[in-house]
């Protein structure tokens, strides 16, 4: 089984559930109650392993702060990103403009294809909460893959399973692009 590594930047406005998602995926403890929201200072990195077909993939989630206070760090954090997961609060469609800024700063400098980018609306919910009715993106980013996931911080397993059903598509797209880039670099070396 071949092993590969992927760097996935997880970006979006503040308080959209980026850290909750990353911690849940990495099976890390999730804070509840008064201490449940702790703003990310610049970046948090979580790692997971996935098996995609014949490939074992070590995924690093770079959970990037949504605060403009850390915007000067974005070029460094965006360096060599293999994929981009943009997170939005489905109850705040005005955040779509913010996602366009993240796209320009993370996807465009890395020449990411649409298969390497995804928008995920995360509904943080309590037991028994419904999924709501997010209508998806309406602007320039509507060409990207979009998903909607509900996560209950007290019991995130169902939300994690749903998230993986979408994220595996992102991982496969990022892995395919990475393999193609490696193959191209090998071909160029042979030509010299």
Curated annotation (Swiss-Prot):
GO terms for molecular function: GTP binding. SUPFAM superfamilies: P-loop containing nucleoside triphosphate hydrolases. The keyword Ligase does not apply. It comes from the Eukaryota. It holds the Pfam family Roc. It is found in: Cell projection, Cilium, Flagellum. The keyword S-adenosyl-L-methionine does not apply. Keywords: Cell projection, Cilium, Flagellum, GTP-binding, Nucleotide-binding. CDD domains: Ras_like_GTPase. GO terms for cellular component: motile cilium. Gene3D superfamilies: P-loop containing nucleotide triphosphate hydrolases. InterPro entries: P-loop_NTPase. GTP binds at residues 12-19, 62-69. Component of the intraflagellar transport (IFT) complex B. Functions in regulating the cellular pool size of both complex A and complex B and thus plays a critical role in determining the cellular availability of IFT particles. Component of the IFT complex B, composed of IFT88, IFT70, IFT52, IFT46, IFT27, IFT25 and IFT22. Belongs to the small GTPase superfamily. Rab family. PANTHER family: DRAB5-RELATED. This is Intraflagellar transport protein 22. It comes from Chlamydomonas reinhardtii.
């Amino acid at each position: 089984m071949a092993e590969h590594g992927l760097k996935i930047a997880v970006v979006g406005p503040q308080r959209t559930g980026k850290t909750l998602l990353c911690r849940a995926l990495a099976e890390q403890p999730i804070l509840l109650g008064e201490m449940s929201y702790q703003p990310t200072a610049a970046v948090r990195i979580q790692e997971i392993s996935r098996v995609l077909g014949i490939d074992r993939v070590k995924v690093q989630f770079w959970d990037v702060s949504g605060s403009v206070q850390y915007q000067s760090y974005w070029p460094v954090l965006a360096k060599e990103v293999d994929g981009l997961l943009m997170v939005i609060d489905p109850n705040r469609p005005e955040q779509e403009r913010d996602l366009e800024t993240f796209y320009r700063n993370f996807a465009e400098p890395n020449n990411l294809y649409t298969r390497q980018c995804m928008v995920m609306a995360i509904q943080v919910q309590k037991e028994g909460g419904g999924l709501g009715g997010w209508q998806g993106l309406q602007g320039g980013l509507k060409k990207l893959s979009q998903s909607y996931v509900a996560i209950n911080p007290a019991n995130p397993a169902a939300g994690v399973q749903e998230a993986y059903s979408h994220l595996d598509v992102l991982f496969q797209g990022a892995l395919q692009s990475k393999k193609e880039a490696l193959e191209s670099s090998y071909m160029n070396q042979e030509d010299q």
